[in-house]
Structures are given as C-alpha cells and as structure tokens.
C-alpha cells in the first residue's frame, strides 16, 4: 500500500483530498505529519505553487525518518470571466494585494469582488492543479481539474462553516455549492476532477 503525504496544513483541503481518494477506492495510507512547513505561494501559475508545496515537504521529510511513496500538493483558484479570469492564483489574497483587506480573508475577498464586478451573476470557474511528487521515481506528475459555474451576489454573512467561495458559487444546474453535501461535492469538484485525471492515480 502506498504511503502518501498531503502537503497542506489546511484541514478542509486535506479532508477533501482524503475523502476523494477514499471515494475512488485509491488504496493508500495517509501519513499524518505535524509541523509541515507553510509555503508562500510565490509562483505565477497553479503548477508552480503546487510544486513549491510538494518540494517543500520533500525537503522537510528528508531530514527525518519518515518514509513515503508520494506527496500530493495542490493549488486552486477562482477565475471570473468578467475579470479576465482573475483572481486566479491570487484568489486567497485578492483583496489584500489590492489594498482592500486582510491576507487570506474570504470575507474581504468577496466584498472586493462584489465591488468590481458589474453583474449580479457572472460566469466563473474553480480551477485546481494537483501535483504528485513520485518520490521513488523522482518525478512530478501534474493534472488540472475545473468546475464551471457562476459567482452570484448574495446578501449573506460568511462564517467558519463555509469553505472558500462556495456560498457564492452557483453550479450550472442552479444550486449553490455550499448547499450540497460534501459527499456530492467531492464527486464534481475541481479537486476531484484534477485528482481523477492524474496518471499517478490512474496507475
């Protein structure tokens, strides 16, 4: 059984990846490691950021006795057509880099986006790039996934139970992403599509 490390300290993201791997019956053991390094997403692309994360964890475990077969890292973002596919790789800090909010504040990000988009409903998509560092073969295996929909203006208060932009993301069938079950989301999400497209996962 392959031993896998998920290169994130974000429990929501980690649990989503674990659930997806379980749902698709990918046989592996997830290694829970405390103190993984936090990585600054300095890349200009999803691919660069995802590889920064897997490389950082690889350098970290080389200093330990931890044995793993692969490291999974991802970078994801929201692309809004009206904004020429921004915020993209800057999704988590979009308001901050434009002087309009705190670092990694979804509340500030959505307020800023609402201020600069003209439409109450505008085409958007979630993008995810999965990088799997195959340690044995010393190669990076990457794959993209997306989820098409819309960003809609809603007068709701963001709370800790929400994940990313989900309460403001409308699926093409009209449902709000935060309203569907986690199990159902994991079968359609950008992260699911990226993971299931990976040649490493396909074997």
Which residue ranges define each predicted feature?
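Anionic-ligand binding patches
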Residues: 2-5, 12-20, 24-203
């Amino acid at each position: 059984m392959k031993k896998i490390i998920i290169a994130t300290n974000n429990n929501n993201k980690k649990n989503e990846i674990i659930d997806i791997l379980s749902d698709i019956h990918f046989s592996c053991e997830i290694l829970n490691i405390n103190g993984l390094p936090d990585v600054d997403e300095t890349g200009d692309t999803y691919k660069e950021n995802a590889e920064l994360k897997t490389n950082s964890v690889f350098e970290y475990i080389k200093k330990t006795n931890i044995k793993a077969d692969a490291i999974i890292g991802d970078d994801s973002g929201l692309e809004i057509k009206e904004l020429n596919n921004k915020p993209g790789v800057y999704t988590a800090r979009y308001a901050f880099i434009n002087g309009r909010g705190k670092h990694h504040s979804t509340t500030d990000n959505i307020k800023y986006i609402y201020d600069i988009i003209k439409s109450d409903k505008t085409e958007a998509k979630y993008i995810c790039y999965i990088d799997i560092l195959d340690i044995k073969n010393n190669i990076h295996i990457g794959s993209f996934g997306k989820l098409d929909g819309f960003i809609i203006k809603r007068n709701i208060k963001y709370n800790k139970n929400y994940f990313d932009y989900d309460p403001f993301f409308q699926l093409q069938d009209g449902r709000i992403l935060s309203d569907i079950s986690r199990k159902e989301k994991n079968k359609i999400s950008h992260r699911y599509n990226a993971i299931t497209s990976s040649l490493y996962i396909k074997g």
